[in-house]
Amino acid sequence: MGREGWSRVLSATGENRERSLQKFMTETLTQLGQMVGLPASPEVAVLETFDNPHPDRQYLVRFVAPEFTSLCPLTGQPDFAHLVLDYVPDQRLVESKSLKLFLGSFRNHGAFHENCTLTIAKRLEEAMNPTWLRLGGYWYPRGGLPIDVFYQSGEPPAGVWVPEQGVAPYRGRG
């Protein structure tokens, strides 16, 4: 369903709107509303997107994953991060359940912090082609050193409110 279909969903009222929305979701999104297991790896995880209902406006979308996990590729020990994703959509938005499943697919995936953070950013850019994207990976210490990894696709668009990510630098007990 393209832009016209989305416009029909938004303009419908009452029961018609509910039916239109349900039809839209079942025709375009395969994971939302379904029992879907965690993907075996980030490579096979599917990031689903849908048409931006407001492509005439620039606005920021934020997702926060405070309990992101992956595995150290050398020791197999778990690594933990607080991820903050900000993006300004163009024509497509990422569907939140598919994003949650994609992020969860890293749970048993071995990769260094930098690789995890940049892989997530690159996959999101490929799926949505946003106007602007920023990902902050605030990794908890391993071996005594916190590693924070930041990616930004460029300068944020003028006139878009981009709040601080709000994650304090790691201080431990100090």
From Swiss-Prot:
<keyword id="KW-0521">NADP</keyword>
<comment type="pathway">
    <text>tRNA modification; tRNA-queuosine biosynthesis.</text>
</comment>
<dbReference type="InterPro" id="IPR043133">
    <property type="entry name" value="GTP-CH-I_C/QueF"/>
</dbReference>
<dbReference type="Pfam" id="PF14489">
    <property type="entry name" value="QueF"/>
</dbReference>
<dbReference type="GO" id="GO:0006400">
    <property type="term" value="P:tRNA modification"/>
</dbReference>
<protein>
    <recommendedName>
        <fullName>NADPH-dependent 7-cyano-7-deazaguanine reductase</fullName>
        <ecNumber>1.7.1.13</ecNumber>
    </recommendedName>
</protein>
<feature type="active site" description="Proton donor">
    <location>
        <position position="79"/>
    </location>
</feature>
<dbReference type="InterPro" id="IPR029500">
    <property type="entry name" value="QueF"/>
</dbReference>
<dbReference type="GO" id="GO:0005737">
    <property type="term" value="C:cytoplasm"/>
</dbReference>
<keyword id="KW-0671">Queuosine biosynthesis</keyword>
<keyword id="KW-0963">Cytoplasm</keyword>
<comment type="function">
    <text>Catalyzes the NADPH-dependent reduction of 7-cyano-7-deazaguanine (preQ0) to 7-aminomethyl-7-deazaguanine (preQ1).</text>
</comment>
<feature type="binding site">
    <location>
        <begin position="94"/>
        <end position="96"/>
    </location>
    <ligand>
        <name>substrate</name>
    </ligand>
</feature>
<comment type="similarity">
    <text>Belongs to the GTP cyclohydrolase I family. QueF type 1 subfamily.</text>
</comment>
<dbReference type="InterPro" id="IPR050084">
    <property type="entry name" value="NADPH_dep_7-cyano-7-deazaG_red"/>
</dbReference>
<dbReference type="GO" id="GO:0008616">
    <property type="term" value="P:queuosine biosynthetic process"/>
</dbReference>
<feature type="binding site">
    <location>
        <begin position="113"/>
        <end position="114"/>
    </location>
    <ligand>
        <name>substrate</name>
    </ligand>
</feature>
<dbReference type="InterPro" id="IPR016856">
    <property type="entry name" value="QueF_type1"/>
</dbReference>
<feature type="active site" description="Thioimide intermediate">
    <location>
        <position position="72"/>
    </location>
</feature>
<keyword id="KW-0560">Oxidoreductase</keyword>
<dbReference type="GO" id="GO:0033739">
    <property type="term" value="F:preQ1 synthase activity"/>
</dbReference>
